[in-house]
Amino acid sequence: MKRLVSLSLALFLSLSAFAQIDYSNDSLRVVNAEWRVDSLDGFTLKRYHFGEGELFCSAQHLFLIEIPASSPRRLAFAHDSIPVEVSTLAERSGALAAVNGSFFDIDAGNPVCFLRINGIDLGENTPGKDDSINRKYYQYATLKLADGRPLIAVPDSNRRWEESLPEKDIMTAGPMLIMNGRMVPQRDDRTFVTHRHNRTALGIRRDGTTLLLVADGRFKHRAEGLSLPELERVMIWLGCTDAINLDGGGSSTMYISDKPNNGIVNYPSDNKNHDHEGQRPVSNAIIIL
């Protein structure tokens, strides 16, 4: 019995220590990072590589687009009925920059989250296997564009909620990462949440600045990727008051026009090589015009 009590106490102390991890050093590393900065036409590209063990006890490679509220640049959505690379969607649209958008069926190619572009509904929130009414975990945040400016909303559980919205450009993804300056608690029973993956996210600062973040992943010792709680922390350290998670993994891609390597600035992992050639064909993208 004493041994059982001792083991239980040790487990409790271990879990308590885990729950009280001190992220102050990580936050300072993000806030004080000497980003490689490219000032572009109405927006800024920033890049920073955290070496092995430097951020969340791991190596991380972050790519960030910042669009000031005063910029003439606007966001839009691009889509194709057949998955194509982010660079292709961007070039067809004459975009200055782009990141991958929301989730899609990798086999069939269709969106699995609600998508409306220029007033035309192109995708719906696909139901779960046992539930035709409620939405899935990655459908619990909605990105709306008003004159090219992003607004993030939390939908209700009914998966058809977006259909009644008046905005002409709507993209559902998720989950919500930050709302009103606070991190949103995430379910911890899914590898989608707890495991490290490549990530793409959109955030908004209080002053109206829009952030588009891509975190590379799946490259041990170079870029291990982020869990969703780690992604939340990065976004809040970057000053976001609201933020939404987008499709990630092999889909995570950032494009900047006129850059080398077909405009791809990060290291997409779909080809499993640490280069700029690993774009995954996707259903949709967020573009900067």
Model feature map: region roles:
Residues 59-64, 139-140, 174, 196-201, ...:
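Short glycine-rich loop/turn motifs
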